[in-house]
C-alpha cells in the first residue's frame, strides 16, 4: 500500500484529502505545515507528498526545495489557491512534480496521485535494473581481469 504525506494547514481540507485517499486504497498521514512534513519524513517512509504552498512556519516551496537539496526525489503534488502562472512556475522550479489549483476536484487529485506514483515506481524499477546491470558488469570484469593492490 502506498503511503502519502499531506501537508495542508486547513484541517478540514487535510481531513478530506486523507479520507478520499484512504477510500481509494492509500495510507494517508496529515500534517499542518512544512516543518511537520520534514519531521515526518525523518521518522517514516512516504511514497508521495501532497503539499499546500501557503502554510505557516515553512511553506510548500521551501518544503520541496529542502527535499530536493537533500537529494530526495519523492514525487510532490502541490495543491494551492495560488492560480497565477508565476506561482505555478515557481512550484515547478522549486521541484514539485505536479500542481493543482483549489478548489480541487478530488477525483482528479486521485488520478494525478496514481499517475505520479506509477511514474515514480517505473523510475525506481529502471534504477534497479541499471544498478543490477552495472554490478553484473563489475563482477564479470573482476572475474576476467582480477586487480591486485600490490
Annotate each PLM feature.
Residues 33, 59-62:
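Acidic catalytic/metal-coordinating carboxylates
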Residues 52, 80:
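Active-site residues of response regulator receiver
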